[in-house]
């Protein structure tokens, strides 16, 4: 088995849970390389065609996904060349010729000389994280975000699709984990934000089991990082055996200081410089009391375990 210092690191959790922020901060440590969402079926590596794929030992698709992961960590994976609707002509041409920015960053992270630990930031690999931990000896950090904070974040971006139908097409996943959770609900009649809260319960019910079975898989609440960012990142670096440098400390302070805005500007998806102390409860500005009560119910027992009964 590899020593901990050589293990690649998967930073995962539901989408909009802070995986980009945490992944970027960890990747400031020397000897690391950042990999952006290889399991994203829209702009990640070729071969992944479903959202939130569930893979475990003995799964019918295990060998197929094992080859994909081997290619990712060896630097041989290829990202899709997908242009965004707002890309201008030269940007579209550049992507066709050179590949996306994520692919170029991936190449830099995997092809540079020297032994590098990859920081694989990917919420969409969350349901396969236990398998990746066991089969590929990866360290796994699971980011947990308040269910109402998750809904508020997706609503800010106008993201109204929560991947429940993609999850429900995965027979083994449904049989082993989710049938009991989803059976009582008429999902077709639910509002989109209700589906989002139910997805939150589905994802974290499974990830909670993974962490219970594997003590070295670490669950971290985004809110705890927001309230004490340097302290929490020092703890994460120690757990992962990553050096905590002055550069890392400065980057964390710069990204979480009180002079930064609470919310990202406009519809920006990723904005790393935020007022972290105010961010943890920012959802209360856009989620009314009745909606919060409904989200709490839909988040289920795992929501109560990590965030209590009183919001």
Identify what each model region corresponds to.
Residues 11-13, 36, 119-121, 142-144, ...:
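Short beta-strand segments
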Residues 1-10, 15, 107, 174-204, ...:
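PAPS-dependent sulfotransferases, especially Golgi type II membrane carbohydrate sulfotransferases
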Residues 37-120, 163-188, 276:
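PAPS-dependent sulfation machinery
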Residues 23, 41-44, 126-129, 148-153, ...:
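Short catalytic/ligand-binding loop motif for oxyanion handling, primarily in non-cytosolic enzymes
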Residues 33-36, 137-145, 162-164, 245:
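Short hydrophobic/aromatic-enriched beta-strand-loop microsegments
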Residues 20-32:
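A conserved segment at the C-terminal end of the G1
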Residues 121-122, 135-156:
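Conserved phosphate-donor/acceptor-positioning beta-strand/loop module used by diverse small-molecule
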């Amino acid at each position: 088995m590899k020593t901990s210092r050589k293990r690649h690191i998967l930073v995962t959790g539901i989408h909009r849970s802070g995986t980009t922020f945490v992944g970027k901060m960890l990747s400031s440590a020397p000897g690391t390389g950042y990999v952006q969402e290889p399991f994203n079926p829209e702009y990640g590596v070729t071969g992944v065609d479903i959202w939130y794929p569930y893979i475990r030992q003995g799964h019918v698709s295990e060998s197929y996904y094992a080859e994909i992961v081997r290619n990712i960590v060896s630097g041989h994976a290829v990202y899709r060349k997908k242009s965004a609707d707002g890309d201008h002509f030269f940007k579209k041409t550049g992507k066709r010729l050179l590949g996306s920015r994520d692919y170029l960053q991936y190449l830099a992270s995997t092809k540079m000389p020297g032994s590098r630990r990859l920081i694989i930031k990917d919420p969409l690999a969350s349901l396969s994280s236990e398998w990746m931990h066991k089969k590929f000896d990866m360290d796994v950090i699971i980011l947990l975000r308040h269910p109402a904070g998750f809904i508020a974040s997706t609503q800010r971006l106008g993201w109204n699709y929560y991947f429940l139908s993609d999850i429900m097409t995965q027979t083994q996943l449904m049989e082993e984990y989710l049938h009991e959770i989803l059976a009582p609900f008429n999902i077709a009649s639910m509002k989109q934000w209700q589906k989002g809260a139910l997805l939150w319960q589905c994802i974290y019910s499974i990830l909670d089991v993974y962490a219970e079975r594997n003590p070295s898989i670490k669950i971290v609440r985004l809110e705890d990082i927001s309230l004490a960012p340097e302290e929490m990142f020092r703890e994460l670096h120690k757990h992962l055996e990553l050096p905590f440098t002055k550069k890392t400390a400065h980057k964390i302070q710069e990204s979480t200081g009180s002079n930064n805005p609470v919310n990202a500007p406009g519809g920006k998806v990723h904005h790393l410089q935020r007022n972290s102390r105010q961010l943890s409860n920012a959802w209360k500005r856009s989620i009314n009391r009745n909606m919060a009560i409904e989200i709490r119910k839909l988040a289920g027992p795992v929501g109560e375990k990590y965030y209590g009964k009183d919001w």
